C-alpha cells in the first residue's frame, strides 16, 4: 500500500460565509485522514492520542497550498503518504482532490515525545511499521 486513501464529504459546517470550505478546515480534514490511517493499523485512537500512552506525537509543522475552492456537498478524495524523518519524527504528505481535480496539497511533521517527560523518543514499532508500509 503506497498511499492511504480517505474520502470525506464537505458539510455546511466546513464552509465560510462565502460558501467555500474555510481555509483551516482542510487541515482538520487532513487530520481526519491521518486518524483513519492510524485506526486502519488497528491502533486504538483514544489511547494513541492521550497522555496515558507512552508517547505523544505533536504536529510541529503544518502547511497547505490551495489549488481550487471546494463547496458543501463536494466529495474529497485524500491520499496520504507518511515518511520517516529519522528515528523520532515523520512527515505526512496529503493530496486532496475532487472529481480527480487537485484541490490542495498539505504536509504535517510530527515529533515523537515521551508523554511524561516530553523528551524526544524513538517512534513506536507499530508506527515504524506504518511508515514502512506507506513508503513501499
From Swiss-Prot:
Signal peptide: none annotated. One of its GO terms (biological process) is phylloquinone biosynthetic process. The active site is at residue 16. It is an enzyme of class 3 (hydrolase). It holds the Pfam family 4HBT_2. The keyword Thylakoid does not apply. It catalyses: 1,4-dihydroxy-2-naphthoyl-CoA + H2O = 1,4-dihydroxy-2-naphthoate + CoA + H(+). One of its GO terms (molecular function) is 1,4-dihydroxy-2-naphthoyl-CoA thioesterase activity. Keywords: Hydrolase. Pathway: Cofactor biosynthesis; phylloquinone biosynthesis; Quinol/quinone metabolism; 1,4-dihydroxy-2-naphthoate biosynthesis; 1,4-dihydroxy-2-naphthoate from chorismate: step 7/7. Its EC number is 3.1.2.28. The keyword RNA-binding does not apply. It comes from the Bacteria. Belongs to the 4-hydroxybenzoyl-CoA thioesterase family. DHNA-CoA hydrolase subfamily. Catalyzes the hydrolysis of 1,4-dihydroxy-2-naphthoyl-CoA (DHNA-CoA) to 1,4-dihydroxy-2-naphthoate (DHNA), a reaction involved in phylloquinone (vitamin K1) biosynthesis. This is 1,4-dihydroxy-2-naphthoyl-CoA hydrolase.
Amino acid at each position: 500500500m503506497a498511499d492511504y486513501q480517505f474520502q470525506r464529504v464537505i458539510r455546511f459546517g466546513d464552509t465560510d460565509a462565502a460558501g467555500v470550505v474555510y481555509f483551516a478546515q482542510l487541515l482538520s480534514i487532513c487530520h481526519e485522514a491521518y486518524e483513519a490511517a492510524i485506526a486502519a493499523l488497528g491502533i486504538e485512537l483514544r489511547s494513541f492520542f492521550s497522555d496515558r500512552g507512552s508517547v505523544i506525537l505533536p504536529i510541529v509543522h503544518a502547511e497547505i497550498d490551495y489549488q481550487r475552492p471546494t463547496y458543501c456537498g463536494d466529495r474529497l478524495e485524500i491520499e496520504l503518504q507518511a515518511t520517516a524523518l529519522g528515528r523520532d519524527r515523520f512527515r505526512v504528505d496529503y493530496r486532496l482532490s475532487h472529481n480527480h481535480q487537485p484541490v490542495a496539497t498539505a504536509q504535517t511533521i510530527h515529533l515523537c515525545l515521551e508523554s511524561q517527560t516530553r523528551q524526544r523518543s524513538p517512534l513506536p514499532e507499530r508506527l515504524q511499521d506504518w511508515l514502512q508500509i506507506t513508503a513501499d
